[in-house]
Amino acid sequence: MYSLGNRIAWLQGPGANCEKTGPVPPRPWHLVLLGPPGVGKGTQAEKIVGKFGACHLSTGDVFRHAARNLNGNAPSPAMAIALAAMKRGALVSDDTVVDLVRERAGCLACQYGFLLDGFPRTIEQAYALDGILGNVKRTLDAAVNFFAPEALIIERLSGRRVCKQCRTGYHVANKPPRQAGRCDACGGELIQRDDDKPEAIRTRLQAYAATCNPVLDYYRGKGLLREIDASGDPDSVFEQTREIIQKLA
């Protein structure tokens, strides 16, 4: 039951150790963030959690959590399958991604709602999310789609640089190093990853559109889709995001 006692228990118990939790929200809510790579979903997710609370479940973080195998515990069945696939360099199957999200969404903190970033990416995953929520007698409150012109996304992603030694990230326009081409932290060489080159970015955007457009149509048909122009700076984009979420409270 969602009560003051449960909220206090969450703050003092396992929920306090959740990697990406914010303040306890006024009521449980469930939100998905959609949009192509480079559109700024992660930044908006952090702002949402800081302002409104709930768990931030990113599929990227789920995989990193699985790979780290926190606290030395034996991996869950889904984690074990994901780890084996990643070790082989293979793609993790839809079923395994769904199982990992189901496991993470079952943590104590997530009973107060969660924000999904990077999931669902396929129509099959969208159906699976309906099942995950249905099992706990919850429904999705909204699916927020962030969009921006392709040229702007390519500019954002192609400007990224990473230190060859310590992996610290930079951006030629938004977060430049003090010395061009050199890492502030260790002096290592800054490189552009292959998947941050313009042609690779175009390929990623095409692949995203092919798999995610049916997801957008699905949520549009259910009356859950909200569209946000993410061309502006993060704060101005968050003003649009905030207005949407405040209507859910």
Show which residues each predicted segment covers.
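Glycine-rich phosphate-binding loop of ATP-dependent small-molecule kinases
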Residues: M1-A249
